[in-house]
UniProtKB/Swiss-Prot annotation:
Belongs to the universal ribosomal protein uL29 family. GO terms for molecular function: structural constituent of ribosome. It holds the Pfam family Ribosomal_L29. Keywords: Ribonucleoprotein, Ribosomal protein. InterPro entries: Ribosomal_protein_uL29 (IPR050063), Ribosomal_uL29 (IPR001854), Ribosomal_uL29_sf (IPR036049). GO terms for biological process: translation. GO terms for cellular component: cytosolic large ribosomal subunit. This is Large ribosomal subunit protein uL29. It comes from the Bacteria. SUPFAM superfamilies: Ribosomal protein L29 (L29p).
């Protein structure tokens, strides 16, 4: 998922996506623990997607407070 796509989503949609990604990350970590995970790079991708979503949410919070200068 690209940041541009995330920015087009509403804040509620982003929060729902974060919850979905966290659940996927939990499942991936479980699979890794039982040696059943084939694509270990997916863990990194999911963690990065969560971080990108949270960053966009935080940017919106700061913008609403008027603290973003850019």
């Amino acid at each position: 998922m690209k940041v541009k796509e995330i920015r087009e989503m509403s804040t509620e949609e982003i929060k729902a996506k974060v919850a979905e990604l966290k659940e996927e990350l939990f499942n991936l970590r479980f699979q890794l623990a039982v040696n059943n995970l084939e694509n270990t790079a997916r863990i990194r991708e999911v963690r990065r997607a969560i971080a990108q979503c949270k960053t966009v949410i935080r940017e919106r919070e700061l913008k609403a407070q008027g603290e973003v200068k850019a």
